[in-house]
Amino acid sequence: MSNFSRSTRRKFMFTAGAAAIGGVVLHGCTSPTTTSTGTGTGSSTDQAISPLVEGENAPEVTTAKLGFIALTDAAPLIIAKEKGFYAKYGMPDVEVLKQASWGTTRDNLVLGSASGGIDGAHILTPMPYLITMGTVTDGKPTPMYILARLNVNGQGIQLGNNYKDLKVGTDAAPLKEAFAKVTDPKVAMTFPGGTHDMWIRYWLAAGGMEPGKDFSTIVVPPAQMVANVKVNAMESFCVGEPWPLQTVNQGVGYQALTTGQLWKDHPEKAFGMRADWVDQNPKAAKALLMAVMEAQQWCDQAENKEEMCQILSKREWFKVPFEDIIDRSKGIYNFGNGQETFEDQEIMQKYWVDNASYPYKSHDQWFLTENIRWGYLPASTDTKAIVDKVNREDLWREAAQALEVPADQIPSSPSRGIETFFDGITFDPENPQAYLDSLKIKSIKA
């Protein structure tokens, strides 16, 4: 008999097209050992130590330092701490540490915990690649692995209230003429080459706007976006929740769209670790991964949403009002543009359902191809080779099998196939050059 009871296994199963978010937290065997954790940032509940990490499967170490940014998609790392999942899998001393910006996250990953930095992080999916290649580390590579995707969807593109009369949505075309009337119009994102940079560039380019010609980009840390829009530092910005909803709730801007409307179930954040840490501590890496995966399942249960948002709102985590987090976590959208509030669980942030946790290699290949599109990476970049080096979907599969995730919930291929964007453009991971050729606006460098 497996580690699941039969009833638990039935509850754990997801139906492929379910609109409601379901799932169940995994359970251990009988006669468990109980541990209480209290180290690191945040609090933890008592948890039974899983038999999956006993004896020869015990982690090599009991601690790791993991970074996070105050964004709702960091929830799995935080919930794994608060609910004692790290302890459950033999890692009671894990620290989950707030980072001021993605640049800080990068710098601390390069340092590593032995030098006062961190071992892994909640991170923009392209960043482990840019760090591994040395692109954003002054040419000094720091090899990293992606162990899981943390979420899909859940980001927003906002505009200042002075653009509200344009009623801009997925079609950004009306902004071209409006931006032309502004001296040096700026749009903000959170890290060059990161997901938010890619979303806002794609959206504006689809509307006929060219970076460097029709607008320039600036970097603003997520938690500083709302303050910057209040002083009119930019015309538009892209960032993850809860900051889009906070912008609306404070009445300082409105939302044009949520990124699931650009690309349904698009990949977003990753659980990234330094490669040397994983290679030196393979059992501990698996334990961390199992803890994060269980937290993802917990986060996607509808009955846990309010508790999740209450936890995230705490001073030690986000220090943000509960009201700025909860609606978007339930798929409820008020864009602050005068239109009716609507509910859509298909485009909302997901952590586990619809294979949200599995790190498809094809998605990482798109991010690298898009970085080529905008000149962050040379056209000669061997995207497949670097994806095969960084993306450790094999470790995800190993953890999923240990947790007895049903086989039909483990993707049969590391590719999700051809992806279609809101403007009809398609990306075939087997032919990324065809995608680049199809784009009218790009800045490809040799």
Swiss-Prot record:
GO cellular component: plasma membrane
Chain ranges passing through the membrane: none
Xref: Pfam families: NMT1_2 (PF13379)
Annotated lipid attachment (N-palmitoyl cysteine): C29
Record key words, sorted: Cell inner membrane, Cell membrane, Ion transport, Lipoprotein, Membrane, Nitrate assimilation, Palmitate, Signal, Transport
Lipid modification (S-diacylglycerol cysteine), residues: C29
Membrane topology: Lipid-anchor
Primary location: membrane
Signal peptide: 1-28
Gene Ontology biological process terms from the UniProt entry: cellular response to sulfate starvation; monoatomic ion transport; nitrate assimilation
Residue numbers binding nitrate: W102, Q155, H196, G240, K269
Subcellular location: Cell inner membrane
Assembly mode: The complex is composed of two ATP-binding proteins (NrtC and NrtD), two transmembrane proteins (NrtB) and a solute-binding protein (NrtA).
Domain remark from Swiss-Prot or TrEMBL: Composed of two domains (I and II) organized with a C-clamp shape.
Known role: Part of the ABC transporter complex NrtABCD involved in nitrate uptake. The complex is probably also involved in nitrite transport. NrtA is the substrate-binding protein. Binds nitrate.
Family: Belongs to the CmpA/NrtA family.
Protein name per its UniProtKB record: Nitrate/nitrite binding protein NrtA
Originating gene: nrtA
